[in-house]
UniProtKB/Swiss-Prot annotation:
Primary site of residence: membrane
Keyword Transcription regulation in record: no
Chain ranges on the Extracellular side, renumbered to this chain: 59-65, 125-162, 213-248, 311-339, 407-409, 511-522, 576-581
Catalytic activity: L-arginine(in) = L-arginine(out); L-lysine(in) = L-lysine(out); L-ornithine(in) = L-ornithine(out); L-homoarginine(in) = L-homoarginine(out)
Domain of life (superkingdom): Eukaryota
Keywords of this entry: Amino-acid transport, Cell membrane, Glycoprotein, Membrane, Transmembrane, Transmembrane helix, Transport
Membrane topology: Multi-pass membrane protein
One annotated Gene Ontology cellular component of this protein: plasma membrane
Segments on the Cytoplasmic side according to the record's topology features: 1-37, 87-103, 184-191, 270-289, 361-385, 431-489, 544-554, 603-654
Name of the molecule in the record: Cationic amino acid transporter 2
Tissues in which the UniProt entry reports expression: Expressed in liver, pectoralis and gastrocnemius.
Amino acid sequence: MLPCGPALTFVRCLVRKKNIKGEGLEDSLCRCLSTLDLIALGVGSTLGAGVYVLAGEVAKSDSGPSIVVSFLIAALASVMAGLCYAEFGARVPKTGSAYLYTYVAVGELWAFITGWNLILSYVIGTSSVARAWSGTFDELLGKQISHFFKTYFKMNYPGLAEYPDFFAVFLILLLSGLLSFGVKESAWVNKIFTAINILVLLFVMISGFVKGDVDNWRISEEYLINLSEIAENFSSYKNVTSIYGSGGFMPYGFTGTLAGAATCFYAFVGFDCIATTGEEVRNPQKAIPIGIVVSLLVCFMAYFGVSAALTLMMPYYLLDEKSPLPVAFAYVGWGPAKYVVAVGSLCALSTSLLGSMFPLPRIVFAMARDGLLFSFLAKVSKRQAPLLATLTAGVISAIMAFLFDLKALVDIMSIGTLLAYSLVATCVLILRYQPSLTYEQPKYSPEKATLAASKRESAVSESQINMIQESHFSLQTLINPSSLPTEQTATTVNCFVGLLAFLVCGLSALTTYGTHFIANLEPWSICLLATLVVSFIVTILLIQRQPQNQQKVAFMVPLLPFLPSLSILVNIYLMVQLSADTWIRFSIWMALGFIIYFTYGIRHSLEGRHSDGDGDSCSENSGLQEKNPVEEVDEPENANESDKFLARERTSEC
């Protein structure tokens, strides 16, 4: 039995959960952001330069005019993830986003994996957007900057950029300084650039509807076949099919529309930066859900309007994949409008750069404050900004932008983002079926305390009765469980959620790599597909039968467990689509992260220090279990160092 002790202790270390106390929700960074600031941040980071490029690329190669439907499908898939983030923003209004949510619900190891991948995603995002900003500005100057550096600073090494991008470094360091100065000033800059970007997009939409032609959505297949014969010199062949699809609204069929939706899904990535502002926004329980939902709605309307205007102005098969809007304006005789588009593109890149850089130091700060990364990164400035985390993140991003060719690394961003989306949806499923949720901390009042105490007593009493009645697991208790959640029903849901993730992985792999066998109606593939689909549906229905926690928060995901389950399915399916090279690079980054975690983080974890007082250095501290109220108040020695630095009366000062 002795050898089992260290192993069990080690496992407890990996699954210990963050215990958020009410005091930690009060002592925070400078709360100076409004709901409008969050909406502008979400719109700015999500509605980046892709809106000026992506619509033309997808419409020409995948969707045609039905790109508007592709954006609608992508928006619905993104909203499912956004709603899960919104509920957690209402439940846990602290800095950390998906990292913190995973720490509270699933445990420390998964939290570190999530945070470590988000760091890589934001670093690559910041560096690539900075280089894109530099490249766009260089285009406006006739490529004089790139010509100069290629002549005098050319780098001929594999994996490195063609030339060092000094301008991108300047942009990142300038933005790092702005963020270090204070979040309030950064929010003002972001609102200005976001407003200009939206005005430019409104100009594009109105122009497109004025100069557009509905006939561009009704091009005949015969006309496209004639074009194909001319383009490919197929005049001597019979039964020629069009290389531009079959015409009409969906020239590439519904499969093309779905393929376009998969690409358009990434256009909505970025709203999760709102979830990192939990300690810097006033009334976060309401502001974060509103900010996420409204920003996604605004972005969908912008993508929908621009793609509709673009495909109305110009036939989809003539669209330019790199500069669709300037070419479309030239096509309708409004050539000078390209300068307006250029201004909007630079503003969009500016807000996108801020949207990538803003959450990066906050994830680093949250992990360092919890002891999983080096403690010096948790230091805050007198203006209550994560100073050292911001500067460190800025320097690393600047080095990446200065030296490396980031095109090969951009796909790794998708893994970090999709993994975070999947885990947040998983956490929502797990938490809603737990017997007690005590980390949502309303403002104190004697009346609320008395009411809450009476509710807890009644809930605990009934829960205890149910636990006695359900002491043995059976099919009857699975289908007809108690009216209130118990430890047994919570464990049942946890097992089903794990099974759900396994089924989704199998279903995604089969539909990705076994498409040929399914199309040929191979018996084994059809049987396996049917088994996975039926098991997936039955698992969701069994989860739905379990009792949910009755505690209400400002925002809760509707249609549980169906929406989070569909979100997990969409996200994992998109992860499976990524190339093997991307997963190899991801594995290398994770290996580096595990070295840091198992040599430093697991020993310096703040939750591990809290456990020391119980005589078990790695005892599991669930963020969901109720604690004795006296213990929660009388624990000054366990207070976080950063929280001590931020006195209560200073939290409102910026």
